[in-house]
Amino acid sequence: MKIWVDADACPVLVKQILFKAAQRTQVEMTLVANQHIPVPPDKNITSIQVQSGFDMADDYIVEQCVANDLVITADIPLAAEVIAKGAHALNPRGELYTKESIGSILNIRDFMDTMRSSGVQTGGPGAYGNKEKQAFANNLDRLLAQR
């Protein structure tokens, strides 16, 4: 298992949890972004800067990940693509996307997008707090223990 991080919008708290987990478990981890992302000095942790552009980091992750890798992303279409390749997808709030759930999650996302396009104020997710941080850490640990 390798961890791929869609790092452009990944919260700092999540990156810190990931750095500690990668160092503790010696799992290889790559952060992918269209800007420089600093990483701690560790042979298993790397950062790759892709060209700026729509979905460039997502496309790189989809191209590189393989079955049983873990992708950290809040991007639902990216999660759907990596799940189709047999990888795991976990969002920074601790929600594990699965083959069974990703279709309905995509449908809800598309519906909300349509609502916003028609001028309806839909709001966004709540503030990122301890509950979300703990859910992420717990699911990450569970996935790493299964490898």
Swiss-Prot record:
Signal peptide: none annotated. It holds the Pfam family DUF188. It comes from the Bacteria. InterPro entries: UPF0178 (IPR003791). Belongs to the UPF0178 family. This is UPF0178 protein Patl_1318. It comes from Pseudoalteromonas atlantica (strain T6c / ATCC BAA-1087). The lineage of its organism: Bacteria, Pseudomonadati, Pseudomonadota, Gammaproteobacteria, Alteromonadales.
